[in-house]
Amino acid sequence: MDEAALEPTLVQTLAVSTAKGGRYLSLSPSFQRCSLASWIKENIKKKECCFYVEDGREGICKCGYPKVQHCDEAIKPEDYMGEQWDKHRHVRETPTDAFGDISFGGLGQKTGKYVRVSSDTSCENLYQLMTEQWKLRSPNLLISVTGGAKNFYIKTHLKDKFRRGLIKVAQTTGAWILTGGTHAGVMKHVGMAVRDYTLSSGSMEGQIVVIGVAPWGVIHNRSTLIHPEGRFPAYYSLDEQGQGRLSCLDINHTHFLLVDDGTQGHYGVEIELRARLEKLISKLSLGNRESGVTIPVVCVVLDGGPGTLNTIYNSMLNHTPCVVLEGSGRLADVIAHVASVPVSKVTMALINRLLKRFFMQEYKNFTELQIIEWTKKIQDILRMPHLLTVFRIDEDKNYDVDVAILQALLKASRSDEHAGRHCWERQLELAVAWNRVDIAESEIFTEESQWTSSDLHPAMFSALVGDKPEFVRLLLENGVCVREFLEREETLCELYSHLPSCFFLRKLAKRVQGGKMRRGQEPLPGSRKVCLSHVSEEVRHLLGSFTQPLYIASRYKPTKDDVRLKVPSKGALDLPCSGEEWSADTVWDPGRDLFLWAVVQNNRELAEIGWEQCRDCIAAALAASKILRKLAQESGEDDSEEATEMLELANHYEKQAIGVFSECHSWDAQRAQKLLIRISPSWGRSTCLWLALEAHDKSFIAHSGVQALLTQIWCGELSVDNPHWKVLLCMIFFPLIYTGFLTFRRDEDIQRQAERTEQQKLAMESVFAGQSDGKIKRHLRGFSQKSELKPLNCSSRLMSFLKSPQVKFYWNIASYFGFLWLFAVVLMIDFQTSPSWRELLLYVWLTSLVCEEIRQLYHDFDGSGFRRKAKMYIKDLWNILDVLSIVLFIAGLICRLQASDTVFYIGKVILCIDFIIFCLRLMAIFSISRTLGPKIIIVRRMMLDLFFFMFLLSIWVVAYGVAKQGILIENEERLNWIIRGAVYEPYITIFGNFPTNIDNTLFDISSCSVNASDPLKPKCPMLNADNTPVFPEWLTIMMLCVYLLFANILLLNLLIAIFNYTFQEVQDNTDTIWKFQRYELIKEYHSRPALPPPFILLSHLILFIRGVFLRDLPQRHKNFRQELEQTEEEELLSWEAYMKDNYLASTRQDESQSVEHRIHDTAEKVGAMSELLEREQEMVSATMAKRLARLEEQVSESAKALRWIIDALKSQGCKSKVQPPLMRSKSSDRDDGDSSGQETDDEEAPHMFARQLQYPDSTVRRFPVPEEKVSWEVNFSPYQPPVYNQQDSSESDTSALDKHRNPGGRTGIRGKGALNTLGPNHILHPIFTRWRDAEHKVLEFLAVWEDAEKRWALLGGPAQPDEPLAQVLERILGKKLNEKTKTLLKAGEEVYKGYVDDSRNTDNAWVETSIITLHCDKNTPLMADLNHMVESSLSSHQPLQWREVSSDACRCSYQREALRQIAHHHNTYF
């Protein structure tokens, strides 16, 4: 099968991930109910009686239902007249009429789902109902809880442990709990455990699934559940008082399967269906994967009676492990007391005493035959110790029931026939599925198991995909190598295909299908392939185009086997990968791949583990911050909650980067600064500094170590310790730089090197002490020549001084002030019709500024490309001001050069406004100042707030202005006066310029124009006959008061509050914000030419000539990007990793010393101490009760002995007719289960397989034969075995059977059974052996698989007593092989001959065998034929296989003994 076909698709991942979060496709509830009802009616049936026959009670049928509940056909049947009532014939199936949601009411409004099902319902349909219709996730474990169906007492401590452990194992493993479903006995305890968990958790997420399988005919108030179309919901009331012999459903179960066999009042009708359902689930693959690991099933037993014993017995025969809780009562205590006793000591007398002790009043109902059967079944149970686990609270083990359950499953798994590496891998996969790290640490990763990294890869993949970070960490601690795990490209592709539902997954799906998917649209059926080029393109989009793709074509080249994703297309289309040739400098870092996979899904714990595996940890943390902030920005509209979580995780990794960098900076500042500017091949050849700037990690940039680097870059080759006044003085009189007045960094390096050289010289002198002075001088001279630094010459000092960004900045400040001074002079003094020399100089100056802006636009500082550079340029506010000022200047210049006086004046006005913008540009220059810079940031923030305030204010201004203008003035047509009256006057009113035209007392007709004829006067308001205004004076004054109340008081105070909030917000972080924005200015002046405007034109001319004609553009400076040699790179990263480990260790230590951690630790210790004292008290009480019971029994026996002595004395020396009582020995005391040690039988039990209760391939049950009654010499009067012959036989009469008696003893059945003849039935086993290797270290034998017994066995066949050996071998092996084995027969040796414990044996027929060993050489023709026979048998139901001769190779005792003798004969290990 094509590998790609097995790989999961993205749409499946989306569906599963959504299901994990409890989200399903949004369908209306009515549609879901209709769909459920339709499916149930089609697939689920109920049973009803179709033949009414009274059972002796009036109006009651044999089925238990009253006559009124029978249909007319059942009351008057025509087909069954005269027949006896038979449940199998007179009960029919019809569509069920009881299903839906069940509501129990009360506190919390508990609800569940229920359905009435026929007892013959297909288990496949039931499982489909639960998983597809009820939307239950497939279980990772099935816990079948069985025991007492009636209420019973259980100790408080044991009850708490059971409830806590059951919920814990179900919660952590994702298990289903299966019970009887009624509100009584053990089912009630399970329900109470679920209730306690629900109340404590307070949420429906991670709901425990508890499925009750109850008989429909015994449910009280079941009529409320019946409706042909289903009830949504059905209101069910718990009525324990009126239930009588019936039972109520438990209100704390989540789902109910109500099994209907057509009868009423009969318990146990659900047992068969429940067993079939458990068997079906146990055969399903764990996690719906084809890994060969099936869903494990465990049986938990509390209390219990005869029905529970049958359940345990049958479960263990089906290889289901059982956990018995000692102290829960009755059957559970009986089994617990004999669990540590040898089977040979478990007698009928012991079982009789235990039943009397634990069943008390119920013991009277036990018959002798029942005690015999109980003894036999308990003996068989004890013979399967790998499937039996007893949980005792009085043992010195402080763990709950959950650990006992999981340990029982692992113990059963270890005893599997396929033990070995496969067994360990299965156990590990189970532990991963259960998410139980504690079990894996204690039971799997032990000294017995040796794991390689490749062995743990499947578990690692499951843990990563299943979001189990603790398991991932455990696997890494136990040898998983991330490099080996991610070595194959397909592994990483599969990880991305298994991403849970997240924003990145939707973006990736959109990219795979070419961007045609709309927002919110889920991928639809159809398939395209995903390869790491898709991931690389998406990650590059998130990181920024300044980075290179993370996955190069040579490392991860997409192939035809790439993982498939579902996209909406009609067929399978191959999406070609990007054809871009990626840089070969990009390296493969598996830790980075794992970290990146966890980050994009916003998984904090897995990302933390991946980050710890990264080589370049600071760059990784900063890159994660950038990716997460970008994802949060893009997903904000879709999922604000997810965006918030992403921002929190981004802040976390910014803190991690700060922490590691602080650790590095405290140890070595120079190496730490080198980490900031080194090019990181793992992260797209970016730098830590640039990643932090792109991610807007202000706190990281504000770190003292980063600021020290920026200050160093700012000063250039000058020392950072130079005072500003020295720099300014040298700018005025530059020859001072040659006098030592100004310190250069080279001078400081020389001084430091001289100090180090002096120290090393002293060390070398001490090393070469005693040698000649000439030799010491030669060593010192050679050392000095290797490490000597030369001081800067005069020209280098001058160029270094001029190229310093700090000096450039000061020159540009002076130049800009000169420009503004010249601009102001021209505008105010020298703005003539013909341009003067000052104005011409201004134009030249502006030209230099324009050229510099063009250079900045095209200067690709980080190599990200012109498009990105242009976008960044436009986004900068200061660049916008620069462009605006230049455009306005050009516009003003064009108008100024016109001949028209009007246009000339307009040009001057434009230039004056432009001067304002140039002055505002000064704020950017002074942002470098530590004092003014933060204030400029505050002003910028307040300007943004002012825009929002003006929007609110404009509403009131326009509202009041239009209303006032309309009231006062009639039909004003002059636009300028309309705007003045409706906008301007209301606006200036806010600042205290109150209008006079709204008050009649201040009205002056001379101040206005009546007909609006005077353009310089406003129009008069409407006048009456005496030339006074007619508007209502009270209204305009009231409007003014209300307007001033809202505009002048409310809104202005709101503006003050907004400004105050902005000031406080920025002021708290003003230093951080200033340090972050300081970088932009440093970067600008670092790349700026040395000459200030207007002399900068010379620099621009040189750059133009070099770029256009010489094609020799200057390289980007190494102060911001530095490529390290490979050796230096490895050393630096190793040092960084060491610093990271120090930081993480200190962080963990700080957390452990925190107050919260100490309080939590103290609370845990107090709880453990309280539990220990409580358990100790219960242990003392239980021990005391046992001692008192034993003392009472011994006193009673002593009294009997004394009575016998008295009777003997009375007889005057004659023997007393009364036998002396037998005193109990220590061994009998131990029979009561007080033995603490686990004992085993010294010898094998007599034919154990021949006494199995169920005879193979039949419905016949043997008579139970306890071990003590096996021997024919022992009297067993109740023994009445059935007679069974699979084939008709005339030898079934008693006389013929008595002629043959099984030498092994009683078997519980008479006749031939499935054997051919009475008496011995002979079988011959030829054992072919060979050496696996040339060193003769491993001996192998030819084995055959017995499908019925599910085990490997020896090759063999039937033989007649007097039949020649060659003839038997010919029938077993064939004629060809038989001819080639004749020579081996001479050297063959008979290693065993005698009785065989076979499950087909009876009292009168049994199996005897003869085993012969035949050793083959590896290069003989016979060996070739045998190997061919093995290969050809693989497809048959009885395959052959060469297996190692070992103690676990065969299960049968006689075959195991034969293999032991063969191993001893060949001197090899067994």
Curated annotation (Swiss-Prot):
Residues 1-725, 739-808, 858-876, 927-941, 1060-1087, 1106-1470 are cytoplasmic. ADP-D-ribose 2 binds at residues 1398, 1400. Changing residue 330 to A: Decreased channel activity. Loss of channel activity. Pfam families: Ion_trans, LSDAT_euk, TRPM2. The chain crosses the membrane at residues 809-829, 837-857, 877-897, 906-926, 942-968, 1035-1059. The keyword Lipid metabolism does not apply. Residues 726-738, 978-1002, 1088-1105 dip into the membrane without crossing it. The keyword Metal-binding applies. Residues 1283-1295 have a biased composition (Polar residues). Binds ADP-ribose via the N-terminal cytoplasmic region. Other family members contain a C-terminal Nudix hydrolase domain that binds ADP-ribose and is important for channel gating. In zebrafish, the corresponding region is highly divergent and has only low affinity for ADP-ribose. Binding of ADP-ribose to the Nudix hydrolase domain is rather unimportant. Belongs to the transient receptor (TC 1.A.4) family. LTrpC subfamily. TRPM2 sub-subfamily. This is Transient receptor potential cation channel subfamily M member 2. The lineage of its organism: Eukaryota, Metazoa, Chordata, Craniata, Vertebrata. The gene is trpm2.
